[in-house]
């Protein structure tokens, strides 16, 4: 009887708790939600710093497909 109680407790209580914890643990979604709360100036600074990190292409290599304004 004790073994059946342990098995029932495991599947009816512990297993659902473990799956609920996995559903709530989504760091990428939380990170995106936090970034949406920034004011427009902070978002602009973040975007500008990301754009500055891109390297310009070599003018000799450049063709009509270069859209970033470096060529």
UniProtKB/Swiss-Prot annotation:
Gene Ontology molecular function, alphabetical: ion channel inhibitor activity; toxin activity
Keyword Signal appears in the UniProt entry: yes
Record key words, sorted: Disulfide bond, Secreted, Signal, Toxin
Official protein name in the record: Conotoxin Qc3.1
Residues in the signal sequence: 1-24
Taxonomy of the source species: Eukaryota, Metazoa, Spiralia, Lophotrochozoa, Mollusca
A GO term from the CC aspect: extracellular region
Protein source organism: Conus quercinus
Disulphide bond pairs: 56-66, 57-70, 62-71
Expressed in which tissues: Expressed by the venom duct.
Subcellular location(s) of the protein: Secreted
Main location: secreted
Record comment regarding domains: The cysteine framework is III (CC-C-C-CC).
Matching InterPro entries: Conotoxin
Protein family membership: Belongs to the conotoxin M superfamily.
UniProt keyword DNA damage, yes or no: no
Prodomain positions: 25-54
């Amino acid at each position: 009887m004790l073994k059946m109680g342990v098995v029932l407790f495991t599947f009816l209580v512990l297993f659902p708790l473990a799956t609920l914890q996995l559903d709530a643990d989504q760091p990428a979604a939380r990170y995106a939600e936090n970034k949406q709360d920034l004011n427009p100036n902070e978002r602009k600074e973040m975007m500008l710093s990301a754009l500055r990190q891109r390297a310009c292409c070599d003018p000799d290599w450049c063709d009509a497909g270069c859209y970033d304004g470096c060529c």
